[in-house]
């Protein structure tokens, strides 16, 4: 509630809001239409901004240096931000307000200094708050399209991760039998 009081006044726009869009990629067999999206925990608006609030009960806030880092496999990759940025990219095309993705880590929200605002920037450098995702949307979509092309490419081989801890919360573990 402290975070909401600090952000107030705002208008609650929705909870558990499904957002989806179709994305086309090229394959050797022709074009493939994919539905991408997910469920946004909460949407609220204030002025000319629509804020995505993604609640997190665990994990640690991470600050990506840039969009590329979201698509680079690494143990410290800020994967929660990827999900929220995907929602933001979809919403940027569905309405005219600025879209501000945010992550609300429940276990950290009681701190006076905590802010759910996502920031980007290099370590020990000034950070840029992501208050208008439109500035990042084109690069995010370009890299997402490239990733999906790679996933559906018959030339690429995909193997299971060696780190089975990553499988604990994976939506696809039933497919790979982990």
Regions found by a protein language model. Give the residues of each.
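RecB-family 4Fe-4S metal-dependent nuclease core
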Residues: 1-178
């Amino acid at each position: 509630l402290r975070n909401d009081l600090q952000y107030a006044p705002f208008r609650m726009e929705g909870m558990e809001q499904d957002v989806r869009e179709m994305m086309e990629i090229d394959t050797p067999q022709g074009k493939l239409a994919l539905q991408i999206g997910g469920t946004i925990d909460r949407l609220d608006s204030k002025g000319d901004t629509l804020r995505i609030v993604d609640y997190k009960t665990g994990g640690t806030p991470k600050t990506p240096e840039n969009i590329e880092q979201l698509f680079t496999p690494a143990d410290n990759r800020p994967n929660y931000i990827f999900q929220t940025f995907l929602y933001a990219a979809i919403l940027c095309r569905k309405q005219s307000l600025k879209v501000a993705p945010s992550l609300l880590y429940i276990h950290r929200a009681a701190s006076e200094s905590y802010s759910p605002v996502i920031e980007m920037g290099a370590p020990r450098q000034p950070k840029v708050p992501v208050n208008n995702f439109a500035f990042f949307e084109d690069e995010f979509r370009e890299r997402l399209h490239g990733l999906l092309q790679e996933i559906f490419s018959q030339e690429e081989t995909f193997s299971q991760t060696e780190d089975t801890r990553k499988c604990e919360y994976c939506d696809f573990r039933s497919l790979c039998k982990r």
